């Protein structure tokens, strides 16, 4: 599968996750914030909390849950990228409520698992 195909599939499932989270009451801010450090798929606001979302898709869960694809190295990149986003938008990371969620999608989008606070800063 080529890069274009992976990107198109990624966009499709990120769009599905975006719609799902909006139906849950989160307010969409931005998609695909990219830096040299990494990328954040989706950014939302829930009440006063900035929510950074990693979207993962697996066609078949027999090889494990899509959420398991977020390893410690990926989590560290997400956190560093989130701090860059906060800085760019004038937020102070020490005084800003934030969390890191994962949306795991399986079965061609028929199974969506939203894991709030899936990644902790430490």
UniProtKB/Swiss-Prot annotation:
Please name the Pfam families in this protein's record.
UPF0102
Citing just one GO molecular function, the answer is:
nucleic acid binding
Instruction: Name the HAMAP family for this protein.
Output: UPF0102
* PANTHER family reported for this sequence: UPF0102 PROTEIN YRAN (PTHR34039:SF1)
Entry similarity comment: Belongs to the UPF0102 family.
Q: What is this protein called?
A: UPF0102 protein VV0603
What species does this protein belong to? Vibrio vulnificus (strain YJ016)
Native organism taxonomy: Bacteria, Pseudomonadati, Pseudomonadota, Gammaproteobacteria, Vibrionales
């Amino acid at each position: 599968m080529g890069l274009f195909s992976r990107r198109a599939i990624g966009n499709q499932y990120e769009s599905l996750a975006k719609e799902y989270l909006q139906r849950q009451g989160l307010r969409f801010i931005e998609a695909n914030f990219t830096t040299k450090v990494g990328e954040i798929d989706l950014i939302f606001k829930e009440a006063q909390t900035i929510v950074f979302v990693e979207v993962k898709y697996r066609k078949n869960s027999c090889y494990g849950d899509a959420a398991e694809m977020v390893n410690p190295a990926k989590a560290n990149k997400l956190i560093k990228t989130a701090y860059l986003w906060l800085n760019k938008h004038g937020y102070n990371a020490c005084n800003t409520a934030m969390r890191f969620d994962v949306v795991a999608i399986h079965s061609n989008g028929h199974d969506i698992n939203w894991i709030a606070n899936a990644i902790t800063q430490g």
